[in-house]
Every structure is written in C-alpha cells, then in structure tokens.
Amino acid sequence: MTASLTTKFLNNTYENPFMNASGVHCMTTEELDELADSKAGAFITKSATTLEREGNPKPRYISVPLGSINSMGLPNEGIDYYLSYVLNRQKKYPDAPAIFFSVAGMSIDENLNLLKKIQDSEFNGITELNLSCPNVPGKPQVAYDFELTKETLEKVFVFFKKPLGIKLPPYFDFAHFDIIAKILNEFPLAYVNSINSIGNGLFIDVEKESVVVKPKNGFGGIGGEYVKPTALANVRAFYTRLRPDIKVIGTGGIKSGKDAFEHLLCGASMLQIGTELQKEGVKIFERIEKELKDIMEAKGYTSIDQFRGKLNSL
C-alpha cells in the first residue's frame, strides 16, 4: 500500500504539502529556482517591501542547538524583483501549480500599495501578507493589535480579489485565539500561516559571555525545535476556530516526517520549513517526504486527508 502526499490547496494540486518558509532560501532568483527544481511541493518568495532593503546588521542569523535565532530585519530585493520572477515563471510554466508570493510592508499604507501592485499585475498565484515580523526595530507586530488587524483587512479586501493568506505570530492565550479567529472569520481569507518565529528570544554564548546576534542587543526570533509545541498549538487552535474554507499552513519546528505528521494531524494543509532548510538545504524535502510516507504506510494511510485534523483528545 503506497501512501500519496498529493495535496489540494485552493484549487491547486501539489505533489506534496512541503514548501519553504518565506525568509529562507528565497532571497535571489537562483535560490528560488533551486526551490522550484527541488522536491518541495510548492515555494514562496522572500517577503517583499516596496524597495530593496539591506536588513539589520550582521551577525543576524545563528543556528543554535535546537533551532535558530534571527533578527534579519526583512532584507529583500524589493517587490519588482520578485514580481518579475514569478511573472516570467508563470509564462514559462503555465501548467505549474500556483506560486506563493509574500509581502511585508513597513506600514499599513505600504502593505496596501504592495497588494495593489499585485492586484493590478498578471500574477495568478497566491499572496501571503506578513502581519507578524518581529525583527524590525520600532515596528510592533500588526497581528498583536487586534483592532489594527481588522482595520488592515477591511482596507485590503476593498480592492484585493486574488487569493490571500496572512502570516501570523504565535498566540499564547485562549482569549487571543478566540478574538483573532472571530476577526479573521469576517473576511474572505484563503488561509492563515502559523507560526512566524517566537519573537524576542535571547541566546547566549557562555564562552564570550555575549549575545550571538547583533541587532536589538541580541534579541531575536526563535525557530526550530524550540517552537514546535507552540506551532502545533496555534495550528490546532486556528483549525478548530476558523471557517472550514480558511486553510491553515503549519510552520515551526518541522525537521522530520514525524514533525510533519503532527502538524497535519493538528489540521495543517501545507507545511513550511525554515530553520532546518537553512541547515540542510533543499535536499531536506526529499528526506522528509520519504519519512512522512513511511509513517503513513506503517499506519495504513494512503492519503493525508485520511488523518488531517483528526487529533484525538483524552
């Protein structure tokens, strides 16, 4: 009995649910081509701003024993660079499943302008609006301000008619899950992506008695194994609270087929990999695909839909 990882997502069919997390291995067209040619089912571009950004001073990304700490500050080549890439790729591969395109403006107005540019373009893929970047000095995360989140989405959906998902920060309180889900259920969102890194962690080099990243006096977003329980909780919380047509992308702590199975069991439709992709490179997709298939076959599952979201309670 062979397990199939075929995944249907927003009228697209992908060979498997795996993709990169925006921010990892997607800065340049060369890296994007490597993702496109890898065993990943889909891929997403680097979160784009209006103009090119250098980001924060280095060192700003460090691998640590159970994951990573980063304070990148949204370095990217600007929206025109990535829009040109995806439009060219659409023309070259018209039958390929949809590409994901990420934007992350420094203000509400910038986000609206970025989305207007996508709306007015010939891009026919899926857009992800990042409302959760924790590493831009002086800029709070929009998605922790519930009124501002609602106000932003109200303005977005006046004009944006293409498939749109939003990337969310981790939430830690049941009341917050309830409040944000109630807001999101009011809008024609395609999906939510949970979670972005856990903001403002601190990792210390005992030998040097020093922090390990330069920006923000060493404070940075935490990813990898450290965040998996929080990521699973957020995936589950949104899967059980959002309208069934709003899908959940699971991100956080996926480095094995077992981790992937857990995210799917919590209700994730697609899976994004960041920290481990940074460590292993694109070959991770082939490994993790095999590991997930092995788990499914051992359990007698032939498709992901047979167990997605069916987490048992005690």
UniProtKB/Swiss-Prot annotation:
Q: What does the UniProt cofactor note say?
A: Binds 1 FMN per subunit.
The positions flagged as active site in the entry are S132 (nucleophile), C133 (nucleophile)
Q: Which UniProt keywords apply?
A: Cytoplasm, Flavoprotein, FMN, Oxidoreductase, Pyrimidine biosynthesis
Q: Which reaction does it catalyse?
A: (S)-dihydroorotate + fumarate = orotate + succinate
Disulfide pairs here are none
Q: What class of enzyme is it?
A: oxidoreductase
NCBIfam families under this entry?
PRK02506.1
What is this protein's name?
Dihydroorotate dehydrogenase (fumarate)
